[in-house]
């Protein structure tokens, strides 16, 4: 037993040493923080050079760009207006007023419902009857 305990302790000590080695590696490898100051300086230089170029031409860069964008938008809007359909060409006789599409066949729904009721295929309040029966069955199940 004593030998087994010694072996276990030796293994534990070895595991602890490996953990320490891993933590040392992590601390030795320092992460460098990115330095964006150089990039910021380059960007500001580019912006200044653009402003001086646009200043020499006599226009501000932002104004000329916005004017170009406005012109593009105006042309796009005019193209959309040309592409829109003319509503005067629509024949109003083809518009369905009832709200139900029947593919050109005119159906009197009241008459059709009466005919079906007379034939006994459906009752006029069929949906309500089914709901009431379901409710009665459900109530009976839970009364126990």
Swiss-Prot record:
Acidic residues bias locations: 125-144
Q: Per the record's keyword annotation, is Transport included, yes or no?
A: no
Where found? Nucleus
Annotated signal sequence range = none
A Gene Ontology BP annotation from the UniProt entry: chromatin remodeling
Q: Do the record's keywords include 4Fe-4S?
A: no
Give the residue ranges for region: Disordered: 1-85, 117-144
**UniProt keyword annotations, A-Z:** Chaperone, Nucleus
Stored Pfam families: CHZ
Provide GO CC annotations from the record. nucleus
Major localization class? nucleus
Query: InterPro entries, from UniProt?
Result: Histone_chaperone_domain_CHZ (IPR019098)
Kindly list the GO molecular function terms attached to this UniProt entry. histone binding
State where composition is biased (Basic and acidic residues): 1-26
Q: Which family does it belong to?
A: Belongs to the CHZ1 family.
Q: What does this protein do?
A: Forms a chaperone-bound H2A.Z-H2B complex that acts as a source for SWR1 complex-dependent H2A to H2A.Z histone replacement in chromatin.
Q: How does it assemble?
A: Forms a heterotrimer with H2A.Z-H2B, stabilizing the association of the histone dimer. Also, with a lower affinity, forms a heterotrimer with H2A-H2B.
Which protein, by its recorded name, is this?
A: Histone H2A.Z-specific chaperone CHZ1
> What species is given as this protein's source?
Vanderwaltozyma polyspora (strain ATCC 22028 / DSM 70294 / BCRC 21397 / CBS 2163 / NBRC 10782 / NRRL Y-8283 / UCD 57-17) (Kluyveromyces polysporus)
Underlying gene: CHZ1
